[in-house]
Amino acid sequence: MIRVTALSNARLALAFIDYMKTQGVDMELRPQGRYAELWLAQDEKLAQVESALEAFLLDPQHPRYQAASWRTGSLHYRGETGAGLRGWLPALRQQAGPLTLGVTALCVLVFFLMALIGDDRVMAALLYPAGPAQYGQIWRWVSHAFLHFSLLHLLFNVVWWWYLAGLTERYRGRASLAILFVLSAVVSGMVQSHFSGIFFGGLSGVVYALMGYVWWHGEKNPGGPLFMPLGVIVFALLWLIAGYFNILGIAIANAAHVAGLVTGLLMAFWQTRRGQSHGYQR
């Protein structure tokens, strides 16, 4: 057994142990006074553990480590850190950059404007272009993403946006997030309008683009900061299936979801092919 390090915060020590377990490394926590010592039985994996520990100490609240605790069933860690709403919200607040916050604020503002002055007036200004006469109104190609038609619709999209866009802005930069937002809004709008006309709205096409983008980067760089928990991937796929088979009994912009997902995957694929998969910001 090798003593790797000692941490003064036992909760963080457990989180790191959970994460290393998902990487195929078994570690042991030994209380030592006010400290929690981390011990490793597999000598040959010491370099891997030290590298992972360095990244962990830079950002111990990253959702990757909480996701690892969920996957390994570490109830002790979840209970002490106040998982769920109390555990996630501080991490979400930390990672939201200016663009993430700005889009969130615009979505909320537009929603309240619709309630105050009426849906028709707001939609008339922000809907996808109805034809060539409106093609020059450039904002319409993306402004449909800010329209939400119920509180549940708004909350669903904004929470996912906050989480995924926050990760992307923090680790891939504001420019990457801005490009992905514009591309996915335009492409998902074009595809959805082909199937259902212009009366649609919501951030979900962009959200699905972010899901594809983050997932691809996580697959290509497993040790990097961008990561999609398996539960989120399963949920996204089930939501797509439910929409196509009308299981939920509500109107869902299925074409926009698929178009957004493909856009995000393609942008991540392009970046990783150009050798940008490790170009993370800190």
UniProtKB/Swiss-Prot annotation:
GO terms for molecular function: serine-type endopeptidase activity. SUPFAM superfamilies: Rhomboid-like. Its EC number is 3.4.21.105. InterPro entries: GlpG_N_sf, Peptidase_S54_GlpG_N, Peptidase_S54_rhomboid_dom, Rhomboid-like_sf, Rhomboid_protease_GlpG, Rhomboid_protease_S54. It is a multi-pass membrane protein. It is found in: Cell inner membrane. Keywords: Cell inner membrane, Cell membrane, Hydrolase, Membrane, Protease, Serine protease, Transmembrane, Transmembrane helix. Pfam families: Rhomboid, Rhomboid_N. GO terms for cellular component: plasma membrane. Its main location: membrane. It catalyses: Cleaves type-1 transmembrane domains using a catalytic dyad composed of serine and histidine that are contributed by different transmembrane domains. The chain crosses the membrane at residues 97-117, 145-165, 173-193, 195-215, 224-243, 248-270. The keyword Transmembrane helix applies. GO terms for biological process: proteolysis. Rhomboid-type serine protease that catalyzes intramembrane proteolysis. NCBIfam families: PRK10907.1, rhombo_GlpG. Belongs to the peptidase S54 family. This is Rhomboid protease GlpG. It comes from Sodalis glossinidius (strain morsitans). The gene is glpG.
